[in-house]
């Protein structure tokens, strides 16, 4: 038997709390990296408890394997390789590969539409 769906206000509070935890993790990383890693673990627990996604802004800022907060230039390396963004975790060596075909496609479409609009005028 299912437990039922959580109210929308609970989910909104959980998302707001996850944003706060990730912002604190970013602020605390310089002085206390272990504390920022703890904030990431707490945010992940919130997302599993309330069955919500971690906000897109923060989804690329932690390692999916070791759950450490990634700060480019300190414990993460970001590279652009073959139409994808490679984020290398400096803690465990895990590589996250994120394609960016959609961005290129939208850019091409916008360029095509602007040329089409110019020709119509």
UniProtKB/Swiss-Prot annotation:
The keyword Metal-binding applies. Its EC number is 3.1.26.5. Zn(2+) binds at residues 63, 66, 89, 92. It is found in: Cytoplasm. It holds the Pfam family Rpr2. Keywords: Cytoplasm, Endonuclease, Hydrolase, Metal-binding, Nuclease, tRNA processing, Zinc. It comes from the Archaea. It catalyses: Endonucleolytic cleavage of RNA, removing 5'-extranucleotides from tRNA precursor. Its main location: cytoplasm. Gene3D superfamilies: 6.20.50.20, Immunoglobulin FC, subunit C. Its cofactor is Zn(2+). One of its GO terms (biological process) is tRNA 5'-leader removal. GO terms for molecular function: ribonuclease P activity; zinc ion binding. Binds 1 zinc ion per subunit. One of its GO terms (cellular component) is ribonuclease P complex. PANTHER family: RIBONUCLEASE P PROTEIN SUBUNIT P21 (PTHR14742:SF0), RIBONUCLEASE P SUBUNIT P21 (PTHR14742). Part of ribonuclease P, a protein complex that generates mature tRNA molecules by cleaving their 5'-ends. Belongs to the eukaryotic/archaeal RNase P protein component 4 family. Consists of a catalytic RNA component and at least 4-5 protein subunits. This is Ribonuclease P protein component 4. The gene is rnp4.
């Amino acid at each position: 038997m299912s437990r039922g769906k959580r109210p929308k206000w609970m989910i909104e509070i959980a998302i707001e709390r996850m944003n706060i935890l990730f912002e604190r993790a970013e602020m605390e990383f310089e002085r206390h990296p272990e504390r920022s890693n703890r904030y990431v673990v707490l945010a992940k627990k919130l997302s599993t408890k309330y069955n919500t996604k971690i906000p897109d802004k923060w989804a690329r800022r932690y390692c999916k394997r070791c759950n450490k907060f990634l700060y480019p230039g300190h414990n993460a390396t970001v590279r652009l390789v073959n139409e994808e963004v490679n984020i290398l975790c400096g803690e465990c060596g895990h590589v996250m590969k994120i394609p960016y075909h959609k961005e290129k496609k939208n850019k091409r479409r916008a360029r095509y539409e602007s040329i089409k609009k110019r020709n119509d005028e």
